[in-house]
């Protein structure tokens, strides 16, 4: 059989075989194209959603990192404040106790410095002097020191409390003419102001 005859015969067979096929079966390539387009649209939509989720994920990561940095900064600030408060407590924690001790100490100093010719009393005064010295040493070990204000010093409102202003020919205006009680410092702060009389 020749090639031509075979082709004709095959074509006849094709037509005879396809006579019985329905219209829907002939539309399969078209249906497949529609399905492909639908699937492609779904895939594109899914890819877009994935990209949106990736973008959202990046945004959330940045937000979390920013929040973490803020929290670290806040923790650092709180730690600094806490450390500063702790230093202040260590430096100035003894202030209240020192104030309570200094008032009787000043009275004891006045007793020690009062003139006395009685030998028995002088023996007690020597004992009081030792006590005053020991208390001063304890105070100094906690960085609490007397100002040692003297008559003739200039009045300083940051260190002294003027109890009285008196007329004086001997002293200049604002010069201290009398010390009623000495002042005390704790580190760099005034613990107790010196109470003084000043010339006007």
UniProtKB/Swiss-Prot annotation:
Chief place where the protein resides: cytoplasm
Keyword Transit peptide recorded: no
CC annotations in GO: cytoplasm
A Pfam family annotated for this UniProt entry: GrpE
Localization terms from the record: Cytoplasm
Domain of life: Bacteria
Record family assignment: Belongs to the GrpE family.
Protein name: Protein GrpE
Protein's organism: Mycoplasma capricolum subsp. capricolum (strain California kid / ATCC 27343 / NCTC 10154)
């Amino acid at each position: 059989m020749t090639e031509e005859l075979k082709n004709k015969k095959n074509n006849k067979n094709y037509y005879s075989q396809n006579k019985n096929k329905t219209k829907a079966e002939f539309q399969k390539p078209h249906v497949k194209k529609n399905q492909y387009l639908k699937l492609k649209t779904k895939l594109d939509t899914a890819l877009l959603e994935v990209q949106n989720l990736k973008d959202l994920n990046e945004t959330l990561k940045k937000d979390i990192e920013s929040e973490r940095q803020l929290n670290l900064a806040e923790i650092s600030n709180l730690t600094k404040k806490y450390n500063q408060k702790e230093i202040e407590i260590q430096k100035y924690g003894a202030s209240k106790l020192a104030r309570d001790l200094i008032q009787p100490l000043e009275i004891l100093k006045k007793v020690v410095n009062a003139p006395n010719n009685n030998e028995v009393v002088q023996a007690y005064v020597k004992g009081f002097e030792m006590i005053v010295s020991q208390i001063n040493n304890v105070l100094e070990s906690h960085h609490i020191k007397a100002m040692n204000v003297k008559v003739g010093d200039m009045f300083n409102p940051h260190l002294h409390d003027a109890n009285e202003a008196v007329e004086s020919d001997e002293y200049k205006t604002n010069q201290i003419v009398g010390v009623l009680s000495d002042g005390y410092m704790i580190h760099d702060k005034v613990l107790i102001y010196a109470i003084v009389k000043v010339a006007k």
